[in-house]
Structure formats: structure tokens, C-alpha cells
């Protein structure tokens, strides 16, 4: 596609405020964290399809999260790299389904939504036969929670001992001033609230609340395709964590005031709790700082926090009781741990879903199904049924076991 065809196109705005792009841009920066390279995809497409893809992706970028746009772009990159496609029709969809296989068949949902919008926008190169083929194919839902099911020592929930060792270690090293306040607060919030990393790094000072009922965090929703900081859930926290977060906010305010040599008390509430100090340092004028304060620009990057979290166990010598190796630590394991602990304590599926901020109870079922106490109880109940039956089949005390089996069945009704 010649650049002159798209250079005159309008500027498109990403879902996240502050970020925009043109169709001709090689790189579309969608928020502080994520960007996409759509021209790597269109370089693999026939000429008459290129503009259609770019326009549809631009529409998506204005409506959906950057992570979702990355998923779309990455999937199309692999699809058009694996086979030659002149138009997206039933044959192309069939080939994609074969290419994905049963394990990744769920990704067809991404394609289905995207090309349906493509077709509705009346852009060429998507045939109605493609949509009909997608209706015929049985799309298998993504199997989530495998690490929870297996109680994976490296990816699944932490044991009580492992969890306590982590919390004790960061507390010890924080008081010894060997770990920074922001990382200490971040790990505690992951452990206590079970919230997703993006929810925590989206927090602002005004989200920290103290009243006669206690201490709270007003945590923004992020996964359910919400706009940046538009919907929230209130979470209660302990007073000691409130104090630590207040101290962190004070440090952030002092850093900004020192940088610009001006007081910002009136804007304190807008300060990110987890602030990217490098971005503050790079900003030249207080006017530019205030202009970007309502966006995600000065919030810490998730990738940076994940890397710091990953290195904590080796830095502070925290090992797994199951493998004797350094614990593989990430935010997801804290969520798994909270869900599993609640299930062990007998919490209902609704309570677990609310605690983990799940959109529905479906994602929380994995904790109830795989609660070890539930498994033990089921096994105990079934053994009364299977033990006499297996003895009969093996010829052991047939009459006695037959009576046991008949009694069990009759008692069951």
C-alpha cells in the first residue's frame, strides 16, 4: 500500500487519553504500556486488503484496551504469515482453525468479533462465507486455571508457608530499609487484595480513604473493557498499610514539588500512588505535568513492577518448601493464593468472585472445584460405594460385601 493513500487520513485517538496515531504510522502507541505495529501485518496482506485492516484496527483501538488490540494484531500477523490469503473467506477460516488446533481454537473468537466489525464497516475483503464458517465451527472456551487445578509449585497458589515467608521477608527488609516503600506497598496490596497489577498501578492518591468505618482503597476496574478509572470497587485495608501508602504519597508529592519548585497540594489527589519518577524527571514544565496528570502517563509501568516482583525471592532468599528453589513470584500467584485460601475457609463462589473482582462467578469455580478438602470429602464418600463393589469383583468375601453394597445403595435413596 502506498503511503500517499493513508497519509491524508485523520488522526485516530486511542481508548486511553493522550495517545493518538495516524494509519500511516509504523508504531501505534496506545497507552504508557503497550504499542502495536500494524504494518508488520499489512506487509503480509494483498494490496486491496491493507487499508481495510488498518481502518478496522484503528476503530478497535478507540474502543478496546491496548492488550486486546495487541492480541488481534499478533493473531493476524501469525495467520497471514502461516498461509497465503487473497480474501478472508470460508477457506481462510477453515485453514486458520486447522492451524490453531484444539488447544488454541478459542482464539477464533477474536477473529470472529474483528471480521464481523470489519464487514459491518463495509470495508472490502471479508466474505459472508467466512462468518458462516465461524458459526459452524465449535469454538472451545479457553481452559483457565490449569495451574490451580494441578497445584503447580511454580505457577499455582502459594502454600501457607511460602506465602508467610514472602510477607515476613518483605516486612523485615522494609524495616531494614533494604526495600523501597513503593515495592513494599505493591506486594502487600497484591497479597491482601488479590487485585490485578493494572488495577493497582492505576491507583491515585485520592483513592486512599480513611473515615469512621476504617481504611479503604477505591480500586479501579480495568479488565471488563472499562475506560481508564471510570468504575471502582471499594476494598478495606489495614491501618498499617494505609499509613505506608500515605507515606508513599507524601514522598511522591515531595519529589514533584522539588522538581518544579512549586507546591502542588491542590493536585495531590491526582498523584499516582505508584509513580514513574523517571517520567517526572523528563518533564520540563509544570504545565505539561498538570496536563498529563489525569492520564496514565505518570503511572508506573506494569512491566517494571513485574520485573521487580520476579527478582524479590532471589534477592531476599525466599525459597519454596516444595522445590527448595527460589519461589517464582508474579501477581497471578497472589490472586490464585487468595482464591484458594477463601475456598479453604468455606467462602461461597460469590464471595470469591467479589474478592477477586471477577466479572462473573464462572472464573471462580476453579477454586471451589479444586479445594483439597472438597476432594477429600468426595473421595471419602465414594470409597463407601466402590470398596465393596471392587471386593465383589475380586472375589473377596462376596456375600458380606454384597450386603454392604446393597445397604449403601438402599440408604442413598
Predicted regions and their residues:
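Charge-rich, intrinsically disordered N-terminal extensions
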Residues: 1-156, 162, 168-171, 176-178, ...
Amino acid at each position: 500500500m502506498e503511503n500517499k493513500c493513508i497519509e491524508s487520513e485523520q488522526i485516530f485517538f486511542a481508548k486511553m487519553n493522550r495517545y493518538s496515531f495516524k494509519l500511516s504510522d509504523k508504531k501505534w502507541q496506545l497507552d504508557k504500556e503497550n504499542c502495536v505495529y500494524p504494518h508488520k501485518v499489512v506487509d503480509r496482506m494483498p494490496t486491496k486488503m491493507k487499508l481495510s485492516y488498518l481502518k478496522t484496527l484503528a476503530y478497535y483501538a478507540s474502543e478496546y484496551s491496548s492488550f486486546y488490540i495487541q492480541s488481534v494484531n499478533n493473531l493476524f500477523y501469525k495467520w497471514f504469515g502461516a498461509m497465503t490469503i487473497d480474501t478472508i473467506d470460508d477457506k481462510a477460516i477453515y485453514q486458520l482453525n486447522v492451524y490453531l488446533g484444539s488447544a488454541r481454537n478459542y482464539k477464533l473468537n477474536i477473529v470472529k468479533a474483528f471480521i464481523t466489525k470489519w464487514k459491518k464497516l463495509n470495508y472490502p475483503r471479508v466474505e459472508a462465507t467466512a462468518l458462516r464458517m465461524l458459526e459452524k465451527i465449535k469454538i472451545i472456551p479457553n481452559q483457565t486455571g490449569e495451574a490451580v487445578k494441578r497445584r503447580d509449585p511454580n505457577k499455582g497458589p502459594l502454600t501457607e508457608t511460602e506465602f508467610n515467608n514472602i510477607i515476613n521477608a518483605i516486612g523485615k527488609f522494609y524495616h531494614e530499609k533494604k526495600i523501597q516503600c513503593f515495592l513494599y506497598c505493591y506486594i502487600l496490596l497484591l497479597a491482601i487484595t488479590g487485585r490485578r497489577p493494572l488495577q493497582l498501578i492505576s491507583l491515585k492518591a485520592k483513592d486512599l480513604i480513611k473515615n469512621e468505618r476504617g481504611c479503604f482503597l477505591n480500586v479501579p476496574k480495568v479488565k471488563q473493557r472499562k475506560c481508564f478509572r471510570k468504575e471502582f470497587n471499594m476494598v478495606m485495608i489495614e491501618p498499617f498499610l494505609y499509613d505506608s501508602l500515605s507515606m508513599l504519597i507524601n514522598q511522591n508529592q515531595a519529589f514533584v514539588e522539588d522538581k518544579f519548585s512549586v507546591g502542588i497540594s491542590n493536585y495531590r489527589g491526582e498523584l499516582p500512588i505508584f509513580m514513574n519518577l523517571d517520567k517526572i524527571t523528563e518533564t520540563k514544565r509544570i504545565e505539561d505535568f498538570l496536563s498529563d496528570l489525569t492520564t496514565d502517563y505518570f503511572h508506573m509501568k506494569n512491566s517494571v513492577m513485574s520485573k521487580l516482583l520476579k527478582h524479590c525471592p532471589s534477592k531476599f532468599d525466599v525459597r519454596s518448601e516444595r522445590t527448595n528453589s527460589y519461589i517464582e513470584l508474579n501477581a497471578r500467584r497472589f490472586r490464585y493464593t487468595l482464591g484458594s485460601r477463601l475456598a479453604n475457609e468455606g467462602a461461597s463462589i460469590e464471595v470469591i468472585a467479589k474478592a477477586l473482582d471477577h466479572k462473573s462467578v464462572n472464573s471462580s469455580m476453579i477454586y471451589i472445584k479444586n479445594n483439597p478438602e472438597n476432594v477429600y470429602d468426595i473421595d471419602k464418600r465414594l470409597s463407601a460405594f466402590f470398596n465393596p463393589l471392587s471386593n465383589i469383583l475380586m472375589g473377596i468375601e462376596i456375600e458380606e460385601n454384597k450386603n454392604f453394597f446393597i445397604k449403601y445403595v438402599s440408604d442413598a435413596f
